[in-house]
């Protein structure tokens, strides 16, 4: 891919992230080139609760239609409910997606590790949360514990 086109694509990714939501203010929003692929990561919790995924993807598709032959966009950790609803949109722009939490059996997780050679998955996610979302990991832990407690208490009330 020509260097100028690479730069244009990276700028597009950055503007797409900002276009999607004000929580993505960091201009280095986890976009990486790897051979013929662009990797665009949406961590599970923020993607589920904070990021309007459809807006981001529509913006990406509009901006990338002309250069689609040069690359494949890969989305990691796209929640399944978004993936199902957006399947035609994803296919139209050659966007592939996978969910880290359910893909260990088909070899997708090592492909993430190969892109980020010096981090395993835990620091990788910590870095996503802290840099892209400015949310300290401890608060995410507290939220998860509270959420699990809420689900358990609701379940026990109904039984």
From Swiss-Prot:
Taxonomic superkingdom: Eukaryota
Main location class: membrane
UniProt key word Membrane: yes
Regions that span the bilayer: 38-58, 135-155
GO cellular component, one term: membrane
Keywords: Membrane, Transmembrane, Transmembrane helix
Membrane topology: Multi-pass membrane protein
Intracellular or extracellular location(s): Membrane
Coiled coil: none
Family, as annotated: Belongs to the UPF0479 family.
Additional free-text comment from the UniProt record: Completely overlaps YRF1-1.
Protein name: Putative UPF0479 protein YDR545C-A
Species: Saccharomyces cerevisiae (strain ATCC 204508 / S288c) (Baker's yeast)
